[in-house]
From Swiss-Prot:
It is an enzyme of class 4 (lyase). Mg(2+) binds at E237. InterPro entries: ALAD (IPR001731), ALAD_AS (IPR030656), Aldolase_TIM (IPR013785). Keywords: Heme biosynthesis, Lyase, Magnesium, Metal-binding, Porphyrin biosynthesis. This is Delta-aminolevulinic acid dehydratase. Homooctamer. It catalyses: 2 5-aminolevulinate = porphobilinogen + 2 H2O + H(+). It comes from the Bacteria. SMART domains: ALAD.
């Protein structure tokens, strides 16, 4: 047998699963994951979203059953998105400020049944407006300051309902500062802010808009969401949000923007949350459903890459499956009787 005179053989550290596990640099844990939930008024609802295989719109009674199951296998956090009936939408998205909308009811119900679960509420107007824009849309433009004023009121209301963290996703200037001031004035000094700091004007949001039945009627979101070509701008947005009082920053999307996650991690001491968005998820699922990729392997790898880039936590539609896989992986090795 030929033996080369090699002093360095990196393969020695890959020779078995046990050896590989003790030197693994990045590990995916259940506490890394945040489950995004689409909530809908009604009962007995579990509607699969056609463009997002395996993802559902839920009524509160049905999602409570799923949460009970997922909490037993390690779920720590959820983020809530509302599916609003068309007859409740109008130009200004006023129903977003209604204390009995599905987000408010969802926060209250989930915190009552699962008090240890971290509940994050999305702050934006696009599910509630007829325009499909994230703010007040007038003369083909989203009005910044008036929209920010509305977000402050919504954030206070969500805090009153029991949200642990509010997450403004609108990309308006100054909204973190205004929300922090409004919540502090009302006594909600311990309610956190997860700011969508670098939210890109990506082509990957289509399935999400299908899920919410929220589509742009005119214009586009490039006047407030970020240019996919830019990274220094993302660092500026993260810096401004940190200065305004954000407790966490977010990069969205995640998989196409790993370089942004890396730089954000290098430039802030705040937690960096990454959002594996609907388009990323649906592309992976399309390949899996065609038999081209292994679902468990590719989803785990996609999330591991995001964490390796520097993400503290990851919002992913695959969270329920990943929790199951991680629970399975954690089972003890079978041992032979000595």
């Amino acid at each position: 047998m030929i033996r080369l005179p090699l002093l360095k053989r990196p393969r020695r550290n890959r020779k078995s699963a046990a050896v590989r596990s003790i030197i693994q640099e990045t590990q995916l844990c259940s506490s890394d994951l945040i489950w995004p939930i689409f909530l809908k008024d009604g009962s007995g609802i579990r509607e699969e979203i056609k463009s997002m295989p395996g993802v559902y719109r839920w009524s509160l009674d049905m999602v409570s059953k799923e949460l009970e199951r997922l909490c037993t296998i390690g779920l720590k956090a959820v983020i809530l998105f509302p599916v609003i009936d068309a007859n409740k939408k109008e130009q200004f998205g006023s129903y977003a400020s209604h204390p009995y909308n599905i987000v408010c009811k969802g926060i209250q119900a989930i915190k009552k049944s699962f008090p240890e679960l971290c509940v994050i509420s999305d702050i934006a107007l696009d599910p509630f407006t007829t325009s499909g824009h994230d703010g007040i849309f007038h003369n083909n433009y989203v009005i910044n300051d008036e929209s920010v004023r509305v977000y402050g009121g919504i954030a206070v209301m969500h805090a009153e309902m029991g949200a642990d963290i509010v997450a403004p996703s609108d990309m308006m200037d100054g909204r973190v500062k205004h929300i922090r001031e409004q919540m502090d004035q009302m006594g909600f000094v311990n309610t956190g802010i997860l700011s969508y700091s670098a939210k890109y004007a990506s082509a990957l949001y289509g399935p999400f808009r299908d899920a919410l039945s929220s589509h742009l009627q005119s214009g586009d979101k490039r006047t407030y969401q970020m240019d996919p070509a830019n990274v220094q701008e993302a660092l500026l947005e993260c810096q401004l949000d940190e200065e305004e009082g954000a407790d966490m920053v977010m990069i969205k999307p995640a998989g196409f923007y790993l370089d942004v996650i890396v730089k954000a991690r290098e430039n802030t001491h705040l937690p960096v949350v990454a959002y594996q968005v609907s388009g990323e998820f649906s592309m992976i699922m399309a390949a899996c459903l065609h038999g081209w990729l292994n679902k468990e392997s590719v989803i785990k790898e996609s999330l591991l890459a995001i964490k390796r880039a520097g993400a503290t936590a990851i919002i992913s539609y695959a969270t329920p499956w990943v929790l199951e896989w991680l629970a399975k992986d954690a089972l003890p090795f079978e041992r032979s009787v000595l």
